Amino acid sequence: MGFKIRNFTGDPFAIATVSFGLIAWIVALAGAAASSQGSFPHFTWWGIAYQIVIILVITVLYLNNNIELYKFTLVGLVSIGFIYTTNSTNNLVYNSSSSGNLCCAAGCILLSILNLIWILYFGGHPESPTNQFIDSFSSNKYANEYIGRSSVLKTEPFDDQQGFNSAASKRFTSTGISLPQENVSQMSQTNTHSQQQQHSTNAANASNATSYFPLTQLHGLENSSQDMMGSAPRDLTQNTNTNSSGTKRNTLYTDSEGGTGITFRYKAKALYSYDANPDDINEISFIKDEILDVDDVDGKWWQARRANGQVGICPSNYVKLIDT
């Protein structure tokens, strides 16, 4: 998500409604300031102050690109503002003939119209015709492809021996251990053999696979990083991943499966934009309305593939299955 000006400027609905709201609020404030306070309804000042807070909150949510997460909250807040502005309009129009009061009433009428529009939009389902029509003008619909982070988030399998040798050497060198080249070659050959064996077995046997590297080939080096660095290394023998809360979550695919041998039977549409956790290489980022190929749709995390071929897992409450 993140605070970005283009999140706001790229949405014509946000620019139009917030700008309209600021103009209407200034008109109401100017009328209230010019009115005789003896005949001015004092509670209207609270309504004017409340309205500018709502406008600022909506602006900040658009700038952070998380307006979708607070739509239901905004419906309640804007509904309260709608009551304030309509009540103030009634008191200003019928209980006073002051030009300042009438100017403030005009601003409150404009704010009431704005609040009604926001209630209809934020209260509508993202798949409703009105919301779909409004969102179709947003340039953020297929923007922000997370190019800058794709190299970090994208999981690429080691399909060749040279790539595996390089990665294995870097992994053990970073812990201060010099790994002989023949051991690295032996490990890469074992990895190639395990990949071939995995593709030749059925899905049931593949799901029960518990070893990416045979422990006998590591010669006790599997715990070297923990001993020397004081932190637990990634568990290479279990198909699990540790999230930020410290609990292990089942990974929906292994490193050797990324990009090959996976059948995606369903398609899903992203209801909201999602930024992957940079500490979890298995998660993928996507944007609102993006179409994803998904499988293993049981549970809170689904296996997914983006249009650019990036494979990972996505939260199920951010996407919706669609008919193909």
From Swiss-Prot:
UniProt keyword Metal-binding present: no
Subcellular location: Cell membrane
Domain SH3, residue spans: 263-324
Segments on the Extracellular face: 34-42, 87-101
Main function: Plasma membrane osmosensor that activates the high osmolarity glycerol (HOG) MAPK signaling pathway in response to high osmolarity.
SMART domains in the cross-refs: SH3
Source domain of life: Eukaryota
Principal subcellular localisation of the protein: membrane
InterPro entries named among the record's database cross-references: SH3-like_dom_sf, SH3_domain, Sho1_SH3
Gene3D superfamilies listed in its UniProt record: SH3 Domains (2.30.30.40)
Topological domain ranges for the Cytoplasmic compartment: 1-12, 64-65, 123-324
Organism ancestry: Eukaryota, Fungi, Dikarya, Ascomycota, Saccharomycotina
GO biological process terms on file: filamentous growth; regulation of actin filament polymerization
Composition bias, Low complexity: 185-204
Topology of this chain in the membrane: Multi-pass membrane protein
Glycosylation sites: N87, N95
Protein name (Swiss-Prot/TrEMBL): High osmolarity signaling protein SHO1
